[in-house]
C-alpha cells in the first residue's frame, strides 16, 4: 500500500515522500552503525558477512513499536531490537490527514572483522 505522507525521521522534512524515505533510510542506517555492537558477532564465533532482518512499526504518535528481528544468533536479534527501540520519535505517517501505523523493514548487514 502506498502511503500519502510517509513517516518523517528528525531532520528529514524536506522534499517529497521519496526524498523523505531515502533520508530516513540513511539516518536509520547511520544510527544503527553507531549504536549496534558489531563485536558481538565475533564474540559469538560468527565470521564473514552477517545479515539481520528487522521489522517494526511506526505508530500513530511516531514511536517505534513491535520490533522483531531475524538473525543467525538470538543475541544478535536482541541487539538489533535494542538498537531499533532507541530510534528517536518521528512524525507519524498520514493517510487522508489522519495519523496511521506504518510498517517498516530494514536489513542490518555488517562484516565481522577477524
Task: Give the label of every model feature segment.
Residues 1-114:
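Charge-biased low-complexity segments
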